[in-house]
């Protein structure tokens, strides 16, 4: 039986018929991670996937419903790592998903170069120029701000881990899209697919999904936009399907 700590809860992933351990004081996944797990290419039958900055394991759990590939999640925060491990155990996915507690910058040396088919990441979004701009909760501060890893770290490590032709998928903020493109190209990952996510019609995009191929040829595709809320401030049909399935 998987135990919960005092500040933890067990949330349903309705579309996937799974449960995940969350904590309002430590970490709770956002819609961004769910969108990344639906956006990323994954091999259906076999292969090797790495999810960097895995948090409580939300992306590996969701990817396991789309792929039979071996999935590895990497998380630097010990408490989040523990939550992810217990969530994997609760869903009886130990044979497919492994969660390791380590710094993602160590992964090329530990896991080997050119060995993975897919790398996914929902990285910290914000640079950390001033202490006053950082969230005061340590767990959230590390998850949201580039304290232990930068965007360049994520992309350079992804490139080292990927096979030629392997795919890297990120979710991030639109303001850093050009930086993502520049870094991908610098590390031999060619941007291939981009999708802009909007809070609702008439608003600016607040999230981007980007996928690149290691050693790929230039041919960028802009996918149709994704709107989260309709005019009644309810989830759009597409988002409802992603979150709740076709029920």
Curated annotation (Swiss-Prot):
Superkingdom of source: Bacteria
GO MF entries: methyltransferase activity
Xref: InterPro entries: SAM-dependent_MTases_sf (IPR029063), Small_mtfrase_dom (IPR007848), tRNA_Adenine-N(6)_MTase (IPR050210)
One Pfam family in the UniProt entry: MTS
Biological function: Methylates cellular RNA.
UniProt family annotation: Belongs to the methyltransferase superfamily.
Protein name: Probable RNA methyltransferase YabB
Species whose genome carries this gene: Bacillus subtilis (strain 168)
